[in-house]
């Protein structure tokens, strides 16, 4: 689908899908991830230089083009992922939604999922629906093996 602008024929800028809720945007994000569909993935993201993406064990990527390139590289690997979401906590307001969750990812034909990935997704309500601003995914810490009599350790 192409966008028409006043006084011209058609422009080459494709019209992005509209996501009426942050949950709709999130569902589209994970569907695109499982299908390794770059165009569908980037429909979810805000076209903004302030977007941020951190893949597990990876650097902080800021800006639409670096984020797009990172997904292109991931999808080019040919590995197909199946993602099961758990431990979801959703904080939402009129203009911003924050989703904290665990991604339980199974790669290719593996029988068991990999260790969970702790993820935070941030969405903003725009004139064209909800769009992703931040995707931060980090490996979940492994539960430490405690010696008998060891109490819990509090970081802060």
Per-range role (PLM):
Residues 4-43, 50-156:
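A beta-strand edge to alpha-helix "cap/lid" segment located at domain peripheries
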């Amino acid at each position: 689908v192409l966008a028409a602008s006043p006084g011209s024929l058609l422009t080459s800028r494709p019209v992005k899908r509209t996501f009426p809720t942050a949950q709709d945007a999130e569902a589209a994000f994970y569907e695109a991830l499982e299908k390794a569909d770059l165009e569908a993935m980037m429909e979810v993201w805000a076209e903004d230089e302030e977007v941020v993406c951190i893949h597990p064990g990876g650097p902080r990527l800021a800006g639409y083009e670096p984020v797009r390139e990172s997904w292109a590289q991931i999808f080019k690997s040919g590995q197909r992922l199946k993602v099961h979401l758990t431990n979801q906590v959703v904080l939402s307001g009129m203009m911003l939604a924050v989703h904290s969750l665990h991604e339980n990812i199974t790669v290719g034909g593996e029988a068991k999922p990999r260790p969970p990935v702790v993820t935070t997704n941030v969405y903003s309500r725009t004139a064209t629906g909800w769009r992703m601003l931040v995707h931060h995914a980090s490996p979940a810490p492994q539960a430490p093996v405690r010696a008998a009599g060891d109490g819990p350790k509090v970081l802060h």
